[in-house]
Amino acid sequence: MAAREFTEEELAKVNEEMFKKMNIEMKHPSKEELEKEIINYLSKTQACSLATCGKDGVPRISVVDYVNEGLTIYIFSEGGKKFENLKENNKAAIGIGTSTKTFKAVRGVNICGAAEVFTEDDEGFAHGMELFRPIFKNFEKQIGIPIEFPKGMMKIIRVTPTKMVYYHNNKGISNAHWEAE
């Protein structure tokens, strides 16, 4: 039998059957409940894969640390191709997942959004740095000296989500879609 694309309805039916076999009740959270679930998950993880694409159409993916403020993601970085891409195209995608070996334990979120880059002269940079302060303090404690970055080296990327898809199979949440208003 040849492979084919399944409709959303067909995929939902297959998912429901799988969850039923695992004795997990499927849940369909409201937008507000889904936002709370996603924020809770974002607050518990720290690394994400950030995907960007410039005018040349060549995608770039970078594994970076992040902090969140609600559903908004902040990334602290020194440079790289991702910044060139974001100058040409402010659309970004983020993948965050919990590594599992079983279907039952799958948990993660895929985010599409608009990215903004802030340098030291921007208000957004100071705000992002404040959000990263606990991480910097912890790192300074680990290495025993203050962290200092050369002026102009570091930037903050803020990704404001437009669409998200969330999974938390143990809770019965699968393929839960969120869209900005």
Predicted regions mapped to residue ranges:
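Short, basic/aromatic recognition patches
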Residues: N23-A47
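Charged, gly/pro-rich active-site loop segments
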Residues: M1-S30, R107-E181
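Short, charge-rich binding segments
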Residues: E84-L86, T102-A105, E148-F149
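Short Pro/Gly-enriched beta-strand edge/turn motifs at strand-loop
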Residues: K44-S49, K137-K141
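Short beta-strand segments
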Residues: T45-G79, L86, A93-T98, R107
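Short acidic (Asp/Glu) patches
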Residues: S77-G80, A93-S99, R133-I145
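Short, surface-exposed beta-strand-loop junctions and turns on beta-sheet-rich folds
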Residues: K81-E84, K101, G172-S174
